[in-house]
């Protein structure tokens, strides 16, 4: 029972990369509920360069529909406020000293449906990435068997293991999508 030059754990790690990317993409979808990840893409013109917001301020969620941005340097408050407005996130900042409050507006039903469609696109892209990894793994196993580095039985066993890993990751992707869809549609 030799596996030749095939590493199933490496294949699983590559598949998990697709779910990690999906988690990151889904985290960026605005759901009507405040999340610090909503302002992650905001770049602030500071100290002569563009910097991520999280390098200039602490972002917290004091209420389900409110973000609080505590700017560390008083001179950067206006720049942070401008960056938030320019980011097209649909958030309007209210500044009190060094604290910028961002109220998250209600999502209408039409916008919620659009967000669900976007979430489905992200999930499908992740599924496709996992299937590509599966295909690469199966191709590698077939080549190993063709070159007589592994037996035909080992090839079949590895192909079954690859399919089990694929099914597991696809199931995880479906669970992530279902959870995000529920979060988006919950009023």
UniProtKB/Swiss-Prot annotation:
InterPro entries: Ribosome_recyc_fac, Ribosome_recyc_fac_dom, RRF_sf. One of its GO terms (cellular component) is cytosol. This is Ribosome-recycling factor. PANTHER family: MITOCHONDRIAL RIBOSOME RECYCLING FACTOR PSEUDO 1, RIBOSOME RECYCLING FACTOR. Belongs to the RRF family. Pfam families: RRF. It is found in: Cytoplasm. Its main location: cytoplasm. Gene3D superfamilies: 3.30.1360.40, Ribosome-recycling factor. Signal peptide: none annotated. Keywords: Cytoplasm, Protein biosynthesis. GO terms for molecular function: ribosomal large subunit binding. GO terms for biological process: cytoplasmic translational termination. Responsible for the release of ribosomes from messenger RNA at the termination of protein biosynthesis. May increase the efficiency of translation by recycling ribosomes from one round of translation to another.
């Amino acid at each position: 029972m030799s596996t030749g030059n095939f590493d199933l754990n490496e294949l699983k790690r590559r598949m998990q990369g697709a779910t990690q990317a999906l988690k990151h993409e889904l985290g960026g979808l605005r759901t009507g509920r405040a999340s610090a990840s909503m302002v992650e893409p905001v770049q602030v013109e500071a100290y002569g360069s563009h910097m991520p917001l999280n390098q200039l301020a602490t972002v917290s969620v004091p209420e389900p529909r409110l973000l609080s941005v505590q700017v560390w340097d008083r001179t950067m408050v206006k720049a942070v406020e401008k960056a938030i407005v320019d980011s097209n996130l649909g958030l309007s900042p209210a500044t009190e000293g060094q604290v910028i409050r961002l109220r998250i507006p209600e999502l209408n039903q039409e916008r919620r449906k659009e967000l669900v469609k976007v979430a489905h696109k992200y999930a499908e892209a992740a599924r496709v990435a996992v299937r590509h990894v599966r295909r690469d793994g199966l191709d590698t196993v077939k080549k190993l068997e063709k070159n007589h580095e592994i037996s035909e039985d080992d090839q079949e066993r590895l192909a079954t293991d690859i399919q089990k890993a694929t099914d597991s990751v696809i199931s995880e992707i479906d669970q992530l999508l279902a959870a995000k869809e529920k979060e988006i549609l919950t009023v």
